[in-house]
Amino acid sequence: MRLKHPTARLALAALLVAVPRSVAAAGTVHAAPAPAGATRLAAVGLDDPHKKDIAMQLVSSAENSSLDWKSQYKYIEDIKDGRGYTAGIIGFCSGTGDMLDLVADYTDLKPGNILAKYLPALRKVNGTESHAGLASAFEKDWATAAKDSVFQQAQNDERDRSYFNPAVNQAKASLRALGQFAYYDAIVMHGPGDSSDSFGGIRKAAMKKAKTPAQGRDEATYLKAFLAARKTVMLKEEAHSDTSRVDTEQTVFLNAKNFDLNPPLKWKVYGDSYAINS
């Protein structure tokens, strides 16, 4: 994932790593109140189409300083973060593998497309910041491909497969839409691995501080621990040192107890104000 704002950077490679879901707390012989997480089952999750669109707008406000995420299919540039080109709706990167996967999938769907000829170059530059075999011609052809609905769908599919679905699936057992979004935004920026600075590491650090709702702890306490763990990781890197997407976005929703992420929503990212009214 890319961050176009000068204080932010792209996420790590999109290599799916399964993270175990929390196990629900066992019941007792005597009747007892259900854990806070149990009430979430009746709520609308982030995979609801409208909620998903809200999530994309929230991410786009930080990534592109715009709520119009559907205008980002054509986006491509080198943001000088050591990961080569950053492009598309969630910043697929030539240096981290997900751009290669995307173009390969697009070619499976539409052989002979305008980007297919760059697959050999994308394989060579994977893991580097190099533009070898790409450069301005690739940028132009990417923008052309972005007009193709098949390529747009390929971007949507790669987003879901590598970022959105893993985040939501790992949150569903315990967290409502806000918590699911917190996972998604984290996996977008930090990658889905298990290292201490990845989503998996952040989640593990949070769970050492607070149990999940499925384990009997209230949702707010766990989410505060998760956001605090994420901030700790962000502050270790200069490129992530502006933590406003946590402080003046997600924490604002949490303090308002808007666990279902219901509009109207008002927040700030990097000092810019945004609103979703419906």
Swiss-Prot record:
Transmembrane regions: none
Keyword match Cytoplasm: no
Active site, UniProt feature: 63, 81
Entry's EC annotation: 3.2.1.132
Single GO biological process annotation from the record: carbohydrate metabolic process
One term of GO molecular function: chitosanase activity
Disulfide bond annotation, renumbered to this chain: none
Compartment(s) of residence: Secreted
Signal peptide from the UniProt entry: 1-41
Pfam families associated with the record: Glyco_hydro_46 (PF01374)
Catalytic activity: Endohydrolysis of beta-(1->4)-linkages between D-glucosamine residues in a partly acetylated chitosan
GO cellular component: extracellular region
Matching CDD domains: chitosanase_GH46
The keyword Lipid biosynthesis is assigned to this record: no
Domain of life: Bacteria
Sorted UniProt keywords: Glycosidase, Hydrolase, Secreted, Signal
Family label: Belongs to the glycosyl hydrolase 46 family.
Cited function: Aids in the defense against invading fungal pathogens by degrading their cell wall chitosan.
Name of the protein: Chitosanase
Lineage: Bacteria, Bacillati, Actinomycetota, Actinomycetes, Propionibacteriales
